[in-house]
């Protein structure tokens, strides 16, 4: 049999568009290491390939025949949405802006008629009394009172129409851009390491609207009594079934209930009672001597990609708890969903163990038909899984004391995806199967509920602390870096951003496992049975297969590809009140800047992807938030100027402050210059 043509994004091994510097500081070069998931569980590529093969040539020839020799145009510039075409007529919830063209500008580029500004930047004072930022005279004491480094998840709690509290994650630090002459953690000064530790975590800052428009600015005077910094050194507590487990006990915390700090917080979510859920992601890279833990722990150290030896930022030089030879359980105290009350600056952040431990990307909540709280979560690593938590108790509006117990008791599930086409119809000819469908089904497999484990050979505490290993045992489906998961407020569908997976090589391709080097990523649409978030079964489809629209194998839900924008590496997701899907990208493998895109998911414009903005050189677009009044679009501009070879003496970006300045990760807001709603 001749080899089958690979799906979109998938032709050659590639690490995407990230710089080597980003890979080093953000995730500890995960792509350079062995894949942590060596289980024999099914890979979503196999499942999706079956569904795609069933369709063969999708609507308007979107994917093309899956046969050898159907080459992809690589030399041509990526296609872009044609601003000269009107596209489909606007309906309710339609969007009418002129798409931003792909570019490499050192600027936040927005559509004609829109404006943007940086609301809060790395080093801006957060706490009253904090000094003004001085790049060449940084101190750890000052940084602990200032806005942290690489901002990610953003959410706004409105106090009234014109004032609000902005929560922002600070995912990681890039010391090469923060300090002149930096080489590595071993040679760094202790003060530099302390500054980096203080630059992690999160911030609560008060913001105010400007002149009744969609523009917002940082409040810089007055009490600002809610402003707060959370860092690696902030006291926290565990709650839920694993709290107090032997797996969480250390010399400094013999009861296993008082963790300290949070690390590598990526995306997140909010609760109906007004708190933040922030997700600890690539926590593994902060520890040393992973090879020197007790033998019984080593399989789990490997499963979570904890490094051996001493390298990286060397937090262990300041606090020895990061040395696993001395404190082997300390690593188990990271990788959780952390709940924080932005309206109580004296409250203790809570690590919710019932939601499991892995490289959490997000925690999107909703209420099921019978009133239970549901949280959707992705594990952002190659070949990892997607999860759902369903509370035992029911949400009662206005009863916050009761509601704050919901995340402590419930059932944690992992997803298994299945294709539904008979094998005899999968001949690779491009002929439609008898059902003519491009979809599949799936189920949520229970892992643990309270103190009851559903995984053979593992206690409830082990399932929660070593969740990846538990999911391996129940044949969960391996995914291509499952990142954000968001539920559509209009349709109820759940959307999963699968960023990419460079590690499926051509040597691994066969008839049952035919996809390699997922270079540009895709988006999965999941519909819960009976539209009930607590359901145990679902259907799924792939409405967006990312890449250059000139590539005949990309797919935009059947929409005319001459009108769409190229998109690569979907990361964070958001919805506007009309139910349009907003997609931010990370590591654009098409050679241009990352951006924010919007795609209707229903009606005639389903699949009509348009680029709304691009971020500056070498930056990532994070934390998109579309305000309820649709007057503002918020984005976190992470790691501007994080290009290979860049240093403070040779910066690759000057954003946001311009000539003569250093690049500063910042949260920006975009609004229509005439006060219209976004997309008007």
Which role does the model predict for each range below?
Residues 1-52:
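N-terminal secretory signal peptides
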Residues 50, 56-82:
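N-terminal export signals
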Residues 91-272, 278-284, 294-296, 300-341, ...:
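Long, well-ordered hydrophobic secondary-structure segments characteristic of membrane-embedded
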Residues 105-121, 129-142, 213-224, 228-256, ...:
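Blade-edge beta-strand/turn elements of extracellular beta-propeller
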Residues 142-156, 254-267, 473-484, 559-574, ...:
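Signature of short aromatic-glycine-proline-rich micro-motifs recurring in repeat-based ectodomains
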Residues 158-161, 271-272, 367-370, 489-490, ...:
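Residue-level detector of Asp-centered blade-edge/turn motifs that repeat once per structural unit
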Residues 190-196, 200, 213-228, 384-470, ...:
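Beta-propeller fold recognition
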Residues 562-602:
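Loop/turn-rich, solvent-exposed surfaces of beta-rich toroidal or solenoidal domains
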């Amino acid at each position: 049999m001749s080899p089958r043509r690979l799906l979109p994004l998938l032709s050659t091994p590639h690490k995407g568009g990230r710089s080597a510097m980003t890979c080093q500081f953000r995730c500890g070069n995960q792509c350079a290491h062995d894949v942590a998931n060596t289980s024999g569980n099914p890979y979503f590529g196999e499942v999706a390939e079956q569904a795609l093969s069933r369709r063969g040539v999708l609507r308007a020839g979107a994917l093309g025949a899956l046969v050898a020799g159907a080459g992809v145009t690589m030399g041509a510039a990526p296609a872009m949405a044609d601003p000269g075409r009107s596209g489909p007529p606007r309906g309710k919830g339609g969007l009418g802006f002129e798409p931003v063209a792909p570019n490499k500008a050192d600027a936040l580029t927005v559509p004609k008629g829109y404006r943007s500004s940086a609301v809060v930047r790395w080093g801006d004072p957060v706490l009253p009394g904090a000094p003004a930022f001085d790049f060449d005279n940084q101190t750890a004491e000052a940084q602990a009172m200032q806005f942290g480094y690489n901002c990610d998840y953003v959410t706004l709690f409105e106090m009234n129409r014109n004032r609000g509290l902005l929560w922002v994650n600070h995912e990681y630090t890039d010391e090469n851009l923060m300090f002149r002459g930096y080489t590595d953690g071993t040679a760094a000064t202790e003060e530099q390491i302390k500054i980096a530790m203080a630059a992690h975590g999160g911030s609560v800052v008060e913001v105010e609207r400007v002149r009744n428009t969609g523009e917002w600015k940082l409040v810089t005077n007055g009490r600002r009594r809610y402003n707060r910094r959370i860092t690696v050194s902030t006291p926290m507590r565990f709650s839920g079934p694993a709290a107090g487990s032997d797996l969480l006990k250390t010399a400094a915390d013999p009861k296993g209930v008082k963790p300290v700090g949070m690390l590598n917080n990526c995306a997140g979510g909010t609760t109906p009672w007004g708190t933040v859920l922030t997700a600890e992601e690539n926590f593994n890279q902060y520890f040393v001597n992973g090879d020197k833990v007790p033998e019984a722990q080593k399989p789990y150290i490997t499963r979570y990609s904890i490094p051996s030896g001493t390298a990286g930022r060397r937090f262990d030089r300041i606090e020895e708890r990061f040395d696993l030879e001395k404190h082997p359980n300390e690593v188990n105290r990271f990788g959780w969903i952390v709940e924080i009350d932005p309206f109580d600056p004296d409250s203790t952040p809570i690590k919710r163990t019932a939601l499991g431990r892995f490289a959490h990307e997000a925690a999107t909540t909703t209420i099921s038909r019978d009133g239970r709280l549901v949280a959707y979560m992705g594990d952002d690593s190659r070949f990892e899984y997607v999860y759902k938590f369903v509370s035992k108790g029911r949400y009662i509006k206005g009863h916050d004391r009761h509601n704050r117990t919901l995340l402590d008791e419930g059932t944690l599930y992992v997803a298994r995806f299945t294709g539904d086409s008979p094998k005899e119809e999968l001949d690779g000819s491009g002929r439609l199967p008898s059902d003519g469908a491009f979809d599949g089904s799936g189920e949520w497999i229970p892992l643990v509920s309270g103190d009851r484990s559903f995984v053979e050979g593992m206690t409830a505490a082990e399932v929660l602390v070593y969740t990846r290993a538990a999911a391996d045992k129940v044949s969960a489906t391996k995914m291509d870096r499952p990142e954000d998961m968001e539920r559509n407020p209009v349709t109820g569908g759940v959307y999963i951003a699968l960023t990419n997976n460079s590690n499926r090589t051509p040597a691994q391709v066969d008839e049952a496992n035919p996809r390699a080097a997922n270079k540009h990523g895709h988006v999965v649409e999941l519909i819960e049975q009976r539209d009930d978030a607590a359901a145990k079964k679902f259907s799924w489809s792939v409405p967006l297969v990312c890449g250059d629209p000139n590539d005949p194998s990309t797919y935009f839900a059947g929409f005319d590809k001459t009108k769409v924008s190229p998109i690569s590496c979907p990361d964070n997701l958001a919805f506007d009140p009309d139910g349009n899907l907003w997609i931010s990208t990370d590591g654009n493998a098409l050679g241009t800047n990352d951006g924010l895109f919007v795609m209707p998911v229903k009606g005639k414009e389903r699949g009509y992807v348009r680029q709304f903005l691009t971020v500056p050189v070498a930056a990532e677009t994070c934390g998109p938030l579309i305000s309820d009044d649709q007057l503002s679009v918020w984005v976190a501009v992470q790691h501007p100027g994080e290009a290979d070879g860049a240093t403070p003496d040779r910066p690759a970006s000057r954003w946001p402050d311009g000539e003569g300045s250093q690049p500063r990760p910042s949260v920006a807001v975009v609004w229509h210059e005439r006060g219209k709603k976004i997309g008007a």
